[in-house]
A protein has these predicted regions:
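Beta-strand-rich binding/interaction modules
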Residues: 517-534
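Loop/helix patches that line or flank the sugar-binding groove of alpha-linked glycan CAZymes
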Residues: 6-7, 214-219, 227, 237-249, ...
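Acidic/aromatic-lined carbohydrate-recognition and catalytic surfaces
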Residues: 2-187, 191, 204-262, 269-271, ...
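Short catalytic/ligand-binding loop motif for oxyanion handling, primarily in non-cytosolic enzymes
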Residues: 56-60, 103-110, 205-209, 262-266, ...
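C-terminal beta-strand-rich structural cap/linker in extracellular carbohydrate-active enzymes
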Residues: 540-558
Length: 558
């Protein structure tokens, strides 16, 4: 594997609206991020990925962009952005922005021009079709529910495609003018000093044309747009062109949001000269999710299910490229709630989860608040929810026959707003996030779970994350933890998540994800205990006895 500057880095994702509010308007902002750079550096973060801060009506929290060259005034100014890039650079940190180019906002100038003249230049920037017999061109269902077709404003005989929200019209990537506009913008931002991009929903840019129906998969007579993506061919032409024209010349770090990639395509996506530097491992986030909706999905994974997912990805990727490992992000419930059952949730199991994912082969991502174990919000009413996807899933559950309480429980378990509640900085008013009224409710547990209290507690989850980042960066272990091989260890032993990382050193990572102790045989002599989430360790010549929820990293002779 050709070595790149980002391979040994730790990435921290910031959802700016909920990170830190510097001016008391209830919305996090760029100056707020700048004020916390030293905290992030101390945590061990090298790269900061910002969710969208472009000018936007925020129909989908900034993933509907009205101007790719402007900062939304709610987040600050372009001068603030320049200062953030400069201040990060002083600390040897890099900034990634979200690249959202499957679609734009319906308030973008391109779409406004398309409304004025659907048959003109900008009409071809989108997928605009004539209505025929009052029927849509196809029966695809959008990711946020309902058909993907919407009437073009002022043109009752025409409709446009949106695979997400109706305020997010899809860009026509078949049009080379669209692609050149996208590439021009990417280069503009790279010239400003970005380290690269996280690339949103990019797998959707290639549609299977002409538009056609699929068998309905729900009672609404529609079929998930994902069904079309399974058959769409030729996306590599677009992604390869973008990499050649925009990413390679700048040695940019890029992370693709890619779902359902085929095993024989991994090399194309993240191998040598791949479309992206990396892509996320979504196997565990998708596991147990039902096509019928959240109400029919598993609210949390068992240890064996989680192990099966992460091990499958590690084996599949191998030495082909660098996967990006996550346990949560802005679109998912909180990791400690999704990967640890309620009865197993305790300080040690939270550290175990952190350690198990963080030391896998690949690039570790930390989402804001994850480092202190922020939890899902216990929503008591849909009035507390802002997320458009959650509102749709609530209605899906009701239509399926769920009671209002059952539908709300499903929303609480999976809502994207779980990860979007304000960061809990302290036990002060509004969790120290803002002097004003926060745009989204603060989790009531902020007095027990907050950064300020964990900063001074050497046994806190935050302190454990610092130990993890320090271990990964330690000169004597970095080579092994970044480039060393991965292999499952005692894979059949129930509720044991264990693997080796072998290279210059031989490391054994062990996690006992159960309330009972269990014995684990050792591969050879233990040279050193590198990390332990408990004070004691019980090792004999041939085995180790792991206490309930114990996580330990050993350097072994073999």
């Amino acid at each position: 594997m050709k070595r790149k500057w980002w391979h040994d880095k730790v990435v921290y994702q910031i959802y700016p609206k909920s990170f830190y509010d510097s001016n008391g308007d209830g919305i996090g902002d760029i100056p707020g991020i700048i004020s916390k750079l030293d905290y992030l550096k101390e945590l061990g973060a090298d790269i900061l990925w910002l969710s969208p801060i472009y000018k936007s009506p925020l129909a989908d929290q900034g993933y509907d962009i009205a101007d790719y060259y402007s900062i939304d005034p709610r987040f600050g100014t372009m001068e603030d952005m320049d200062r953030l890039i400069a201040e990060a650079k002083k600390r040897e940190m890099y900034i990634l922005m979200d690249l959202v180019v499957n679609h734009c906002s319906d308030e973008h100038e391109w779409f406004q021009q398309a409304i004025k003249d659907p048959d003109g230049k900008y009409g071809n920037f989108f997928y605009i079709r004539d209505k025929k017999d009052d029927k849509a061109p196809c029966n695809w269902r959008s990711y946020f529910g309902g058909p993907v077709w919407e009437e073009l404003p002022g043109h009752p005989d025409k409709q446009y495609l949106h695979v997400f929200h109706k305020k997010q019209p899809d860009l026509n990537w078949e049009n080379p003018e669209v692609r050149e506009e996208v590439y021009k913008n990417i280069r503009w931002w790279m010239e400003k000093g970005l380290g690269g991009f996280r690339i949103d929903a990019i797998i959707n840019i290639k549609k299977k044309l002409p538009f056609s129906d699929y068998p309905a998969d729900r009672a609404d007579g529609l079929c998930s747009v994902g069904r079309m993506l399974e058959e769409a061919e030729g996306i590599g032409e677009f992604l390869g062109e973008m990499a050649e024209k925009c990413f390679y010349p700048y040695d940019a770090f890029t992370v693709g949001e890619v779902f359902n990639e085929k095993e024989d395509e991994i090399k194309d996506f993240i191998g040598e000269n791949g479309y992206f530097s990396s892509m996320f491992d979504f196997e565990e986030t998708c596991y147990g999710k039902s096509e019928d909706g959240w109400y029919a999905s598993k609210p949390y994974l068992t240890p064996e299910e989680y192990k099966k997912c992460i091990f499958h990805t590690q084996k599949k990727i191998g030495d082909t490229g660098m996967i990006s490992n996550i346990i949560e992000n802005h679109d998912e419930p909180r990791g400690v709630c999704h990967y640890i059952s309620p009865e197993d949730r305790c300080p040690d199991s939270r550290k175990l989860l952190a350690g198990v994912y963080f030391l896998l082969k690949g690039i570790p991502f930390i989402y804001q608040g994850q480092e202190i174990g922020m939890e899902n919000m216990e929503f008591t009413s849909m009035d507390q929810i802002d997320d458009i996807s959650t509102i749709d899933e609530y209605q899906v559950a009701l239509r399926a026959g769920c009671s209002e309480k059952e539908a709300l429980d499903a929303a609480s378990a999976f809502s994207r707003d779980n990860a979007r509640t304000p960061v809990q900085w302290s036990a002060e008013k509004n969790a120290g996030f803002s002097e004003g009224e926060p745009w989204l409710g603060v989790n009531p547990n902020y007095k027990e779970i907050n950064i300020e209290s964990q900063l001074t507690d050497s046994d806190s989850l935050l302190s454990f994350y610092k130990k993890l980042t320090a271990l990964r960066k330690a000169p004597e272990y970095k080579e092994t933890l970044v480039y060393g091989t991965f292999a499952p260890y005692q894979e059949e032993q129930k509720n044991l998540i264990a693997y080796t990382r072998n290279g210059e050193k031989n490391l054994l990572i062990l996690g006992n994800m159960q309330a009972q102790s269990q014995k684990v045989s050792l591969p050879g002599e233990v040279k050193e205990v590198l990390l332990n989430n408990q004070k004691a360790v019980e090792i004999t010549e041939k085995e180790i006895i792991l206490k309930p929820y114990q996580f330990i990293v050993l350097e072994t002779a073999d």
